[in-house]
């Protein structure tokens, strides 16, 4: 299972599109959010913690790592923010007047951000989803690992897991310091949580008997004899499998 965490608040969150601007750190609010999230997840065993290279994510990840001696930590640029090109560092109220803005909102699959370093939204989604798939393979089916990333990247990963076209990814929210969880299986991904800013870890822990939990999926049990995991977990209600 992958836990997708958006970084905590910064002084620029909201009014400015920070993008890859260096030196954007968590403010006091963001530090408090990161500490609160770390406390919520304290009893959840993590196989690894992986972060975007940007400071606001690394600081959030470091707060979660505090007290987790022996848990490996990594930085993966593929979980970095979208490369917004010439939009980087601009105020959102200014960008909202740009002719490209409504296209970003309604048709992001057709968007490439302006400037030599501007990235396409499909390209950003592809690198992020590929990174998740690579880490799934590297860490194994029963891993529970955390990725600290950015709003648009998290929304793009969740949209892919839900089978949504990228043009619908703006329907998904990823608030600062929120948690989204996806269990990947041989059959399909199961989106366990989205934009969770206050829930406990019930439902994220693997069941006590992981060996006998067919259908428990990545981070929660072994595959059954067919090699696939059929449900989203004990609380799921698949067709023909409960009400």
Predicted regions and their residues:
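Active-site signature of alpha/beta-hydrolase-fold catalytic machinery across serine-
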Residues: 63, 156, 160
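Generic beta-sheet signal
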Residues: 2, 143-149
């Amino acid at each position: 299972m992958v836990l997708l965490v958006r970084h905590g608040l910064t002084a620029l969150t909201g009014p400015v599109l920070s993008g890859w601007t260096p030196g954007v750190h968590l403010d006091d609010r963001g530090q408090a959010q990161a500490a609160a999230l770390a406390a919520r997840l304290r009893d959840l065993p993590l196989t690894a913690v992986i972060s975007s290279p940007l400071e606001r994510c690394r600081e959030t990840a470091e707060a979660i790592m505090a007290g987790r001696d022996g848990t490996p930590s990594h930085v993966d640029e593929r979980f970095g923010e979208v490369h917004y090109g010439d939009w980087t560092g601009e105020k959102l109220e200014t960008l909202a007047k740009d002719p490209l803005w409504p296209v970003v909102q309604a048709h992001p699959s057709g968007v490439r951000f302006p400037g030599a370093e501007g990235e396409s939204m499909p390209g950003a989604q592809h690198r992020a989803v590929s990174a998740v798939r690579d880490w799934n393979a590297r860490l194994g089916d029963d891993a529970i690992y955390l990725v600290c990333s950015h709003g648009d990247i998290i929304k793009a990963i969740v949209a892919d897991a839900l089978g949504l076209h990228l043009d619908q990814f703006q329907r998904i929210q990823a608030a600062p310091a929120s948690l989204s969880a996806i269990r990947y299986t041989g059959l399909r991904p199961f989106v366990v949580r989205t934009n969770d800013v206050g829930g406990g870890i019930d439902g994220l822990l693997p069941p006590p008997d992981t060996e006998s939990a067919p259908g428990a999926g990545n981070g929660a049990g072994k595959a059954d004899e067919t090699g696939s995991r059929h449900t989203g977990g004990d609380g799921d209600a698949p067709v023909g499998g409960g009400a």
